[in-house]
Regions:
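Electrostatic cytochrome c docking/interface patches
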Residues: 24-47, 129-158, 244, 248-249
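Gly/Gly-Pro-rich "capping" loops immediately C-terminal to redox-active cysteine motifs
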Residues: 35, 42, 46, 58-88, ...
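The canonical Cys-X-X-Cys-His
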Residues: 45, 49-59, 115, 119, ...
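Flexible gly/pro/ser-rich segments immediately N-terminal to CXXCH heme-c attachment motifs
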Residues: 48, 73-78, 103-108, 146, ...
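Generic alpha-helical secondary structure signal
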Residues: 39, 43, 81, 110, ...
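Axial heme c-ligation environment in periplasmic c-type cytochrome domains
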Residues: 64-71, 89-133, 174-179, 200-226, ...
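N-terminal export/targeting leaders of redox proteins
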Residues: 1-39, 110, 116, 120-127, ...
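Mature, folded catalytic cores of secreted/periplasmic enzymes
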Residues: 79, 83-87, 133-153, 164-166, ...
């Protein structure tokens, strides 16, 4: 009985102690600094990038399934407003989702700017391209400087000249590069994704950019438009299905 009375006294004392100090001083309650932030309150680039981008683009911006973002050429090629639109709205018809809250994602406008500024500050090298005339990023931009819509015959010739030594003469892959005419790949890669790959290469995989495929002979805006058109012309309506499958019986 004596031991039980002592225990009761201790509990009463602790209760009184808690009442005196108030709820904010309850032992074990996290401090303000220890409380987890709401996702919309996170303002650290590494955390936002890690949650939203690393799964596809790689933990340090490279060697992911999607385009490397740790690429000074790519960051110099794409305008801030274009990059912002891509992140905010996603790319329809591809695996790039919309991240803006306004389009069903989880990032605020401020967080999207943090991602863009963080990539530019960490991985951008704008001074490297001060005296370099970059190709137009999009086909629309290319048309503005006189490039025509891509031509398939010219595109095949451009492919043989600039791409076949890595990806094979028939696009089925070679010693250095994968199959670029694979139906599943072309179903996942938009025309703009193909264009970006031709211009910027894949710095993390050793794929050359538009200047490097043939020494001393950089691709022109027209070459780029032509080879992208030729690649895109090989898309299948139902990739992965044998020819004739699904037709009426």
């Amino acid at each position: 009985m004596k031991g039980r009375g002592y225990l009761v006294a201790v509990l009463v004392g602790l209760t009184a102690y808690g009442l005196v100090l108030g709820c904010d001083r309850i032992p074990g309650k996290p401090t303000e600094a220890q409380r987890p932030l709401l996702s919309s309150q996170v303002s650290n680039f590494n955390e936002i990038y890690g949650r939203s981008c690393a799964g596809c683009h790689g933990g340090d911006g490279q060697l992911g399934a999607a385009r490397p973002l740790r690429d000074p050429l790519y960051l110099a090629l794409v305008r801030h407003d274009t990059l912002r639109q891509i992140i905010a709205q996603g790319v329809p018809g591809t695996t790039m989702p919309a991240f803006s809250e306004r389009f069903g994602g989880g990032l605020t406008d401020k967080q999207i700017d943090i991602v863009i500024d963080g990539m530019q500050n960490r991985w951008g090298r704008p001074q490297t391209f001060t005296n370099v005339t970059l190709p137009p990023y999009s086909l629309e931009d290319a048309r503005a400087v006189g490039a025509e819509t891509g031509d398939l015959e010219r595109g095949k010739t451009a492919y043989i000249t600039y791409c076949a030594h890595c990806h094979g003469p028939d696009g089925s892959g070679g010693a250095k590069g994968g199959a670029v005419l694979d139906g599943a790949y072309l179903a996942l890669a938009s025309d703009q994704a193909l264009r970006t790959a031709v211009i910027a290469g894949r710095v993390d995989l050793g794929m050359p950019d538009w200047r490097e495929a043939v020494a001393g002979q950089p691709m022109t805006p027209q070459d780029i438009a032509d080879v992208v058109a030729w690649l895109a012309s090989h898309r299948q309506r139902l990739p992965g299905r044998p020819s004739g499958a699904g037709q009426g019986s």
